[in-house]
């Protein structure tokens, strides 16, 4: 719980000589979450309370999400600090890696991993699979299909390649294929802009972006600390033993609350439930969380079976009142302004 973590945040601030902000999107099976634009306003609330400072360290755990939201988070954080550090306890994949590229340095534990940043598209025009859901279209999957035809099957004449592309468009809507091309170009441009604060050498930047956007081969590929530092050339730091122990304690406490590895099963729920799926926390800003709240109702069927109904009553962000201090100091970089929360503070 936040009441246990706030002491760890304070110790981390001392250990890194920085202001700590934690952003966690759960990958719990059946109750996962992603980086999304709706978190931006909550970042602003926390950063306004932190105020302009020399250094901000973002503790980040995520499997990815909206790439534009990731870019906006980096740009917003940079408005409040001179140096941006990202601390990766475990996973910062896809859009999480985009955020990491925008930092001046990335602190990775020995178990931490980054990942490719080639986007997967989720649109209403995506192909439908037998269970009725929409199948995400990966930029690299489309590229791999076309390269397989050219490189492995040795198809080079334009007429045959056109036929292969037409066959692809029978399964993937042409507008989705167009969006694939646009997204790849956008990701490359975004990565080039963000990485400037971490890597100066143009050739090294091109190498990093090319690998993350296409040459890794699979969106599931993971990049450990050694590869990120020695082979890619990112500005990666190893935490000290003291720093690592604090990071690990923080991760374990968050995992105990969000249950990353425990699938959410309706068959195991009876009655009301509340599941926290995202966290955004700081010492002065308290704890904001994205929650899904509902009721599981069991009803007997004529054939003797039991039907399980999941009635979701609320899904969105809430503020944890128990994380509030009676008085919070807001600073504009010069003089601290102290105010007391009113009874009308939003929950």
Can you say where each PLM-predicted feature lies in the sequence?
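Terminal-region recognition feature
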Residues: 1-347
């Amino acid at each position: 719980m936040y009441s246990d973590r706030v002491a760890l945040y304070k110790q981390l601030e001392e250990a890194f000589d920085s202001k700590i902000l934690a952003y966690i999107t759960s990958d719990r099976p059946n109750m996962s979450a992603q980086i999304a634009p709706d978190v931006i306003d909550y970042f602003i609330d926390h950063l306004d309370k932190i105020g302009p400072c020399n250094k901000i360290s973002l503790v980040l755990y995520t499997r990815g999400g909206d790439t534009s939201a990731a870019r906006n988070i980096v740009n917003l954080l940079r408005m409040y600090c001179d140096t941006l550090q990202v601390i990766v306890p475990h996973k910062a994949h896809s859009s999480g890696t985009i955020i990491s590229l925008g930092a001046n340095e990335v602190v990775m534990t020995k178990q931490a991993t980054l990942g490719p940043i080639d986007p997967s598209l989720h649109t209403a025009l995506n192909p439908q699979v037998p269970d009725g859901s929409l199948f995400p279209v990966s930029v690299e999957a489309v590229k791999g299909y076309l390269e397989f035809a050219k490189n492995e099957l040795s198809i080079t004449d334009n007429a045959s390649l056109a036929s292969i592309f037409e066959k692809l468009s029978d399964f993937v809507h042409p507008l989705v294929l167009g969006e694939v091309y646009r997204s790849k170009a956008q990701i490359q441009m975004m990565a080039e802009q963000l990485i400037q604060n971490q890597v100066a050498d143009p050739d090294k930047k091109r190498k990093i972006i090319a690998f993350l956007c296409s040459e890794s081969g699979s969106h599931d590929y993971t990049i450990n600390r050694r590869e990120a530092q020695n082979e890619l050339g990112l500005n990666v730091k190893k935490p000290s033993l003291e720093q690592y122990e604090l990071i690990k304690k923080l991760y374990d406490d968050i995992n105990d609350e969000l249950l990353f590895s425990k699938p959410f099963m309706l068959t195991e729920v009876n009655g009301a439930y509340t599941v926290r799926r995202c966290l955004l926390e700081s010492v002065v800003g308290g704890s904001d969380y994205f929650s899904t709240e509902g009721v599981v109702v069991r009803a007997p069927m004529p054939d003797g079976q039991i039907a399980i109904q999941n009635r979701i009553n609320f899904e969105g962000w809430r503020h944890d009142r128990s994380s509030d201090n009676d008085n919070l100091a807001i600073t504009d970089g010069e003089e601290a302004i102290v105010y007391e929360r009113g009874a009308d503070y939003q929950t």
